[in-house]
Amino acid sequence: MSNAITMGIFWHLIGAASAACFYAPFKKVKKWSWETMWSVGGIVSWIILPWAISALLLPDFWAYYSSFSLSTLLPVFLFGAMWGIGNINYGLTMRYLGMSMGIGIAIGITLIVGTLMTPIINGNFDVLINTEGGRMTLLGVLVALIGVGIVTRAGQLKERKMGIKAEEFNLKKGLVLAVMCGIFSAGMSFAMNAAKPMHEAAAALGVDPLYVALPSYVIIMGGGAIINLGFCFIRLAKVKDLSLKADFSLAKPLIIHNVLLSALGGLMWYLQFFFYAWGHARIPAQYDYISWMLHMSFYVLCGGIVGLVLKEWNNAGRRPVTVLSLGCVVIIVAANIVGIGMAN
């Protein structure tokens, strides 16, 4: 396995670790509605950071974006909005299926759709079937899916042992939402594929290869921001028990505390895709769609590890922890199989 591929896998692991940890600051926000908290964090992660970093990277910010036709930018934006819809469905999936089943189904579907639809759309799926490296890579995707399934099973055992139930269990509604979440969340993978002309233009301007994907985030995350912020603001305006004004009428120290923690959560959310861009840059071009598989499987891996570190599994008993550990090992094996496949 080449050093470039190894570093690509490593940066995807770092990005996934940030994704697994980003909600921790949000949990410490006090006396704010979820909608206000999510909006503040989202403004940081989807608007401020993408724009600020792109302004630092690009020699002429406005000239860069105005150089693209609407036919180039619109698919990137719409796929970003597609991801935004998946993001909202994610929370509803947890509500109706519970954390473990919801995450397992949603992540499993988005892993498959986001990874395999890209080469199918690009007409490159034959590379996976007809080459040794491609078949090895496909095997890695399958093993990763098995690993996600094992971790999901561990979560179910934990919830059963600890008496944790879904907020409002509804299998039919939850499965529909989980499938929608999985499909729509893959929009981020499709957006990265559609944004290749933007990456090439950034490279032509002298932007370091590690950073060429970052300017496209202004458009991708702009699409996601409109969906997420629109959803939050509509709820803040229409739901009787929610009030943006009330949330910002608290004591000043508490408001500052909440804003800083929400901003930190937003920063950590953004960092997942900052390092995703680094990992993506190191993956061989013919296998760039594997970035999504690495990110999503590592997200499940890191989520399990973070749960162990935070002692969320302390009262779950030995069997769930053993199954979780097995699932994590399988995901690590999958990453190595994919790496070997890409090297071939």
Swiss-Prot record:
One of its GO terms (cellular component) is plasma membrane. Belongs to the L-rhamnose transporter (TC 2.A.7.6) family. Pfam families: RhaT (PF06379). InterPro entries: L-rhamnose-proton_sym_RhaT (IPR004673). The gene is rhaT. HAMAP family: RhaT (MF_01532). It comes from the Bacteria. It is found in: Cell inner membrane. It comes from Escherichia coli O139:H28 (strain E24377A / ETEC). The chain crosses the membrane at residues 4-24, 38-58, 68-88, 101-121, 137-157, 175-195, 214-234, 259-279, 290-310, 323-343. It is a multi-pass membrane protein. The keyword Transmembrane helix applies. The keyword Transmembrane helix applies. This is L-rhamnose-proton symporter. Its main location: membrane. One of its GO terms (molecular function) is symporter activity. It catalyses: L-rhamnopyranose(in) + H(+)(in) = L-rhamnopyranose(out) + H(+)(out).
